[in-house]
Amino acid sequence: MPAPEQGSLVEEGQPQTHQEAVSTGPGMEPETTATTILASVKEQELQFQRLTRELEVERQIVASQLERCRLGAESPSIASTSSTEKSFPWRSTDVPNPGVSKPRVSDTIHPNNYLIRTEPEQGTLYSPEQTSLHESEGSLGNSRSSTQMNSYSDSGYQEAGSFHNSQTVNKADSRQHPFTGSTSNHVVRTSRAEGQTLVQPSVANRAMRRVSSVPSRAQSPSYVTSTGVSPSRGSLRTSLGSGFGSPSVTDSRPLNPSAYSSSTLPAQRAASPYSQRPASPTAVRRVGSVTSRQTSNPNGPVPQYQTTTRVGSPLTLTDAQTRVASPSQGQVGSSSPKRSGMTAVPQHLGPSLQRTVHDMDQFGQQQYDIYERMVPPRPDSLTGLRSSYASQHSQLGQELRSAVSPDLHITPIYEGRTYYSPVYRSPNHGTVELQGSQTALYRTGSVGIGNLQRTSSQRSTLTYQRNNYALNTAATYAEPYRPVQYRVQECSYNRLQHTGPADDGATRSPSIDSIQKDPREFAWRDPELPEVIHMLQHQFPSVQANAAAYLQHLCFGDNKVKMEVYRLGGIKHLVDLLDHRVLEVQKNACGALRNLVFGKSTDENKIAMKNVGGIPALLRLLRKSIDAEVRELVTGVLWNLSSCDAVKMTIIRDALSTLTNTVIVPHSGWNNSSFDDDHKIKFQTSLVLRNTTGCLRNLSSAGEEARKQMRSCEGLVDSLLYVIHTCVNTSDYDSKTVENCVCTLRNLSYRLELEVPQARLLGLNELDDLLGKESPSKDSEPSCWGKKKKKKKRTPQEDQWDGVGPIPGLSKSPKGVEMLWHPSVVKPYLTLLAESSNPATLEGSAGSLQNLSAGNWKFAAYIRAAVRKEKGLPILVELLRMDNDRVVSSVATALRNMALDVRNKELIGKYAMRDLVNRLPGGNGPSILSDETVAAICCALHEVTSKNMENAKALADSGGIEKLVNITKGRGDRSSLKVVKAAAQVLNTLWQYRDLRSIYKKDGWNQNHFITPVSTLERDRFKSHPSLSTTNQQMSPIIQSVGSTSSSPALLGIREPRSEYDRTQPPMQYYNSQGDTTHKGLYPGSSKPSPIYISSYSSPAREQNRRLQHQQLYYQDDSTRKTLDAYRLYLQSPRSYEDPYCDDRVHFPASTDYSTQYGLKSTTNYVDFYSTKRPSYRAEQYPGSPDSWV
């Protein structure tokens, strides 16, 4: 199934957020009095003065602490052993650390707010106050754990240098911050294994919300959450009580810094683990798609209630505001280095939440300026980041720089299909209650859904290693992996549902590399095609599933993309995924392959898939899979592949037996003793059966060898015929499955006499009496005294079978290939011809009777007799009136073969002559038939009038001579040479009846009208014939050899060049899919809502001179009817589909009442030419003998 089209998300949080931001803005509340405003301003001024003094004292303490950090040599501890996932929690500082004095002083350092971004609709605002970063391990009983949100076992790419390297962070690469008041920040790396719960002591009244950050390898698609400072981009940690990764609030307790050795980060901030700043905030709000940027005068006091929101800033990723303000609050932080190689240090919260907001927006312009001065983006940056990580050796240690490499970003992944999800709100009404009156809206990540199990063993077996910018290692893959943008249409996936409110015990911190990135660059983009193809080889199933689904989406209707995927080798990778153990990967790989091999112009893709073992891989998946959707996709891919001539024989050799035994026989119900109603419903709606029969339909046109193998496949013919019988009994005449079965059987019925040994043994050369003629080549042998008749001993039963009684030569019920030519198959074919309104089914059924009735063997005669017995001749004649070129052509050829039987010839000449003549071009009504169809009608007329003077006279009385003369003389529209020769042949036959020449002369015709010299026909070859056909339409060689063989087009001198392949692919095989040549209407030959149009007309009196009258209009005026340009029937079918369950087919009304549907008059005497209503075929009550017309 193609991936759904990606659409934009409606941000549900915007209206509410905007309202909150406005409601908290200064002066926005109309009921605020001047007295209240003045009091608030004074209170804020006093607070600002107090904070200024505190910060100044703290600056001095920080400077002394910095000096101690530089001089002190730090040794590795247990916290600095290997860890694939590091988190730097915010540390609360209002609980005194042992041995550390914490005076509250003023700080004059201006903070820089960093906007962290994970996706286009989301942003995260962190307070920039910096403190020491520690990650500790403690007992689970006395601590809260940070939350791991949707941990994956397949959530990222591994760096070239593995992070399981047991390196210790012992390099104190400290460097003085260019601004005063900067402090040291410590990164402590614990030995906690990946996926292990991070345990921290909790402290009451201190909370930090961490919901989102830049996407890391561990991020789940449901919640793109921050991993803190996660050097290896490992998985997020899931908190207890927050099973679905809900944002959580954690109380934190200060850790004993002496228990851990730490390496000092180069960029020093205004806080230290030994001098905690009391004014640092303890809550960071994730504001979803709403990015809150507070700006104010950096030098002036901040009013108590003032929160100015900057919307549309380059740092603001969405145009919505949120309210994060409360009275009596301020914020102080350290400034950030204004240089391109900006060192990103995780931000820490201080002890006081009261100063979180007000100073947060004081220096918003300064952080904008910082990003303006950053270096240009690297060409291989994954999300357009601007920081140069290779140049950070002066700020970060080797391992830390390796850890924060930006290329650890991957596409959001999930197990399952391509889902798109809107704004997600957790059960606690989408807001986070902070201290005081502060609230913050948050929204979790909206890309992808689902959890996968994560194992640390998979981290060291990654396929693609990328540049380690810190270690300057060579990359095995130069192109960056960029995240694929997936969104869901509705938030209905069960794994998004929360079972409880958010946990309030986990601490979070932003990742180091996320702080260094320019938020303006955090825009999701569609991945490039080479990236998607490389993701097919990723070790994680969800990445592979997403990549395959995205390829399916890209290939839909785009042949250029299909060819590019083939050029880049994507077909091989998709075929490899067919043997994947994950069901979703199998589905998406099949869907992508189905689109890649759809269409006439994708033969190279089909051949490439065959060459890489795609057909055996599909069959393995079909045999082992029990999932209905997978089986449908597999058979759909095979259906599309079967339209390529170069692949057909490979499918027959490798897949024919498997398709028959695993799909055709079980789904048809042929081997079931009982056929209940439930199986009928399953049978009629089985898409797997539809796809498989469509594949067999294409394969049956691959030539003689293909037909032989399919006929000899056990159970195939029986099952196909059983499907037709079942559908006839359930009145399911127009389904695609029936159409495919009928067309397959038509191809398998071709050249039975010559290709099937059983047919030759069952009775060749025994048809003289049945054909009503003598065949000198068969019944006499030359001798010196002339030809001597053979003496044959025949029982009376073997002489003929007229459709009554047991069939000679068949004493048992037929099985297998014998059922193809058994006369019992005539009845279901005629039922479909009488009841179906699907032109493809009608053409296939008529073509089957055409093939079965051709030939010089007794079963062809039996078929002709069976058609007469089952009253099938009127059914065929009615279809001549149909407004469908290919159906008329097939029916005319079938009638021509039926006329080989003497009694059939009499009936056709008596009751069908007018229909045949009226389909000839000329007269007042324009002809919409192709040259091939007109030639087929002329051949039928020739056969009907041969050796039957009454029929020749009926043709003259019907006005046929005038139309035939117009064709041969080139009057009106020019006809092709084939049509001219066929018409000349009929006229020549009519002139042979000497008794009728007087009638011809009375009507104004002479010999010149009937005899066209061969030289004239040859000259016509060089004339300009605009409508000269180039189609290799030929009659069956068997048809050419029976009856009045002069009616065969081959004897008319109609020879057209054709290759050896054309000889093995006869004209009856119109069933190979040609993919892109199909249009919305399956049958372009008819532009009417219903392709069936049968007119009625009265028979003029015999005494009238019908030759001098204008012919009655054959068709009523219909402005919607268009001229057929080459009606294609089965060359376009089946449709190699791309959409699931999508087979654009024309729906036709049920045709049970022929008087209303086809406009037949309601009279009771059918002998009065064509003016009666034929009795219902399904009533099966036909009066008269087997030779009667009705």
From Swiss-Prot:
Residues 230-241, 324-337 have a biased composition (Low complexity). It is found in: Cell junction, Desmosome; Cytoplasm, Cytoskeleton, Spindle; Cytoplasm, Cytoskeleton, Spindle pole; Midbody. SUPFAM superfamilies: ARM repeat (SSF48371). One of its GO terms (biological process) is cell-cell adhesion. The modification Phosphothreonine is found at T84, T411, T1012, T1016. Residues 772-781 have a biased composition (Basic and acidic residues). It holds the Pfam family Arm. It is a peripheral membrane protein. Keywords: Cell adhesion, Cell junction, Cell membrane, Coiled coil, Cytoplasm, Cytoskeleton, Membrane, Methylation, Phosphoprotein, Repeat. SMART domains: ARM (SM00185). Residues 36-63 form a coiled coil. ARM repeats lie at residues 517-556, 559-598, 603-643, 861-900. The keyword Repeat applies. The modification Phosphoserine is found at residues 75, 106, 132, 136, 139, 220, 230, 235, 272, 280, 313, 326, 336, 391, 402, 405, 421, 426, 437, 509, 511, 514, 775, 1044, 1090, 1099, 1133. PROSITE patterns: ARM_REPEAT (PS50176). One of its GO terms (cellular component) is desmosome. The modification Omega-N-methylarginine is found at R253, R269. InterPro entries: ARM-like (IPR011989), ARM-type_fold (IPR016024), Armadillo (IPR000225), Plakophilin/d_Catenin (IPR028435). Residues 77-86, 138-156, 163-203, 213-229, 247-266, 289-323 have a biased composition (Polar residues). The modification Phosphotyrosine is found at Y371, Y414, Y477. Residues 1-32, 73-347, 772-809 are annotated as: Disordered. Interacts (via the C-terminus) with FRMPD2 (via the PDZ 2 domain). Interacts with PDZD2. Interacts with RHOA; the interaction is detected at the midbody. Interacts with ECT2; the interaction is detected at the midbody. Interacts with CCDC85B. This is Plakophilin-4. It comes from Mus musculus.
